[in-house]
Amino acid sequence: MEQIPFVSSAPNTLGIELELQLVDPRSFDLAAASDELLAQLANHPIADRVKPEITRSMIELNSSVHEHPAGLLAEMREMRDVLCEAADAVGVGVTGGGAHPFMRWQDRAISDTPRFQYLAEMYGYLARQFTVFGQHIHLGVPSGDAAVRMVRGLSPYVPHFIALSAASPYCEGVDTLFSCCRLNAVNSFPLAGHMPADVTDWYRFEAHLAQLRASGLAESIKDLYWDIRPKPEYGTVEIRVCDTPLTVERACQLAAFAQALAVQVARDPEPSQQAWLAYRSNHFQACRFGLHGSYVTPDGQRVRLVDHLRALFDRLAPVAEELGTGDMLQTLRDEILRNGNDARWLRGQFLKVRELPLVVESMAQNWRGQGVQDTPPSAVRRRIRATSEPVGGVCALSTPQGDPLPGWAERLH
């Protein structure tokens, strides 16, 4: 059995990847402009942190590695501004969000790289439907065994990440009734899901991958579309279930949440095998209903996800204070419990403007850090409407009461 080397990283370090939408600034449909944008950035210092994605209407923005989410936020704001300036120069807009509200998968063009061309040939139309946009959060760990333990410890909290980040209620011009429809595209792939429950250490992980290779089911770890997976060449654990948020501020808040949770689960007893029993059901509830979903705890209790999340924020508060991230976690908690997630915001925007291109226009404004302005709409009036799920009252969610580091920085792209 082939051994897989694991590059040791400093614990509690973090970095993120953001998959971003490229849009036409008049119609606000997706624009196949990644080649032009990458060429525009070719001589810029951030050029090696902006990568093509599977279709030409996408790019991936990669951070360096940080000890503290405040340093991450400063870097992401700087890269966002550079990216928007370059996008303006080539005549495209950039937005966050987990799915474009009205794009047609048939119109997508596959990026011209060997891996993406292979995926298109292997998976057919699924490759074009994979024009969805996620945030991946990387957490540094010292060893393969530590990585497997962290994957197991974080797995019961996958629904919390989904609900916090959900930003894909619309697909191909209709309200899907899901808070996060993006993961339905991800789950179409045969090796999607979670790390097998019987993988309890790095040796068993190596053995599992060896079995997949021997059976012709996978060639590398890249073929494992797990919700959370080890990334041995980076020395990280990679959380892959988050929709790309509408702002870099929310993206960095989610990274701070992940960092604090990783510290907490390292101190907690490892979840029992029973924790895997409701994994798929919990996953569905978070995708479909977001914060309003139900959640079955590792010990079998059925609760409201928002109540469990509120209690989790309270439990993480002392850890966040230790890490110096208390303000970021408190801001995330307050904004989520008061206003809901980005999916709720997008539905609220649709109720105001009544046309999905105008929703995308507001997404582009948010990404730039401008907020939504009360200015006359500029989108070409392609009439694309969607029946919107009732937003509901915010009170339903309310309670009554630094610098880049060496190491895997240069590998995170």
Curated annotation (Swiss-Prot):
Its EC number is 6.3.2.2. Transmembrane segments: none annotated. Belongs to the glutamate--cysteine ligase type 2 family. YbdK subfamily. This is Putative glutamate--cysteine ligase 2. The lineage of its organism: Bacteria, Pseudomonadati, Pseudomonadota, Betaproteobacteria, Burkholderiales. GO terms for molecular function: ATP binding; glutamate-cysteine ligase activity. It catalyses: L-cysteine + L-glutamate + ATP = gamma-L-glutamyl-L-cysteine + ADP + phosphate + H(+). It is an enzyme of class 6 (ligase). One of its GO terms (biological process) is modified amino acid biosynthetic process. Pfam families: GCS2. Keywords: ATP-binding, Ligase, Nucleotide-binding. It comes from Bordetella parapertussis (strain 12822 / ATCC BAA-587 / NCTC 13253). PANTHER family: GLUTAMATE--CYSTEINE LIGASE 2-RELATED (PTHR36510:SF1). The keyword Kinase does not apply. The keyword Nucleotide-binding applies. Residues 392-413 are annotated as: Disordered. ATP-dependent carboxylate-amine ligase which exhibits weak glutamate--cysteine ligase activity.
